[in-house]
A protein has these predicted regions:
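Surface-exposed loop and edge beta-strand positions of immunoglobulin-like domains
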Residues: 17, 125-127
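Conserved glycine-rich acetyl-CoA-binding loop
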Residues: 90, 94-108, 115-117, 128-135, ...
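A generic secondary-structure micro-motif detector
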Residues: 100, 122-123
Length: 177
């Protein structure tokens, strides 16, 4: 765990910003998420079309420490409808830098951006097994509104389809009273 002195210095040095095309490989975290390469490229393409917003926590020496993606619209309108509801996904902070406030600040930044865009609701799914993330979301004002089967698929970096079964809780937060 990063000690308190390093933590304060780290927080003063990070930048919260939108993803640039040059960040795409860095989102793979030295190969840990290489299997999401095509998803990252598609998310970036969607961001260029104004359909998504991709955020990172960037440190000048350490690189990308966290990421959070937002779909502004989706075929699943209970998640994102392009007008009132936006869907947060792909939210992660590197393990050594968790519990330092980076995730909370990144989530707040994304929510503030959604309010500026006129969205009233933020929606996300959290794995039923990820209790730490659920606690973060609850502290941030999200509440469980439904279960979600968590079935989705992706093509890995080799074009091989992977089916994921990750039961989740759908959580929502009202951004505009």
């Amino acid at each position: 765990m990063v000690d308190q002195e390093i933590s304060s210095k780290l927080l003063s040095e990070v930048h919260f910003r939108q993803v640039r095309q040059s960040d795409l490989l860095a989102l793979e975290w030295e190969g840990e998420f290489v299997h999401f390469r095509r998803m990252y490229a598609d998310a970036y393409r969607r961001s260029q079309l104004g359909e998504a917003v991709l955020w990172v926590v960037d440190h000048p020496q350490l690189g990308i420490l966290g990421q959070l993606f937002v779909h502004l619209d989706s075929p699943r309108h209970e998640l994102a409808d392009g007008v009132y509801r936006a869907y947060i996904y792909g939210f992660r902070v590197r393990s050594p830098y968790r519990s330092l406030g980076l995730g909370t600040r990144l989530l707040q930044l994304a929510e503030q951006d959604l309010v500026k865009r006129g969205f009233a609701w933020s929606v996300l799914n959290v794995s039923r097994e990820n209790l730490d993330a659920r606690r973060l979301y609850e502290r941030s004002g999200y509440r469980v509104v439904a279960g979600d089967p968590g079935r989705w698929s992706y093509l890995d970096e080799h074009g091989i389809r992977h089916d994921v079964n990750e039961p989740a809780w759908r959580m929502e937060k009202r951004l505009i009273p």
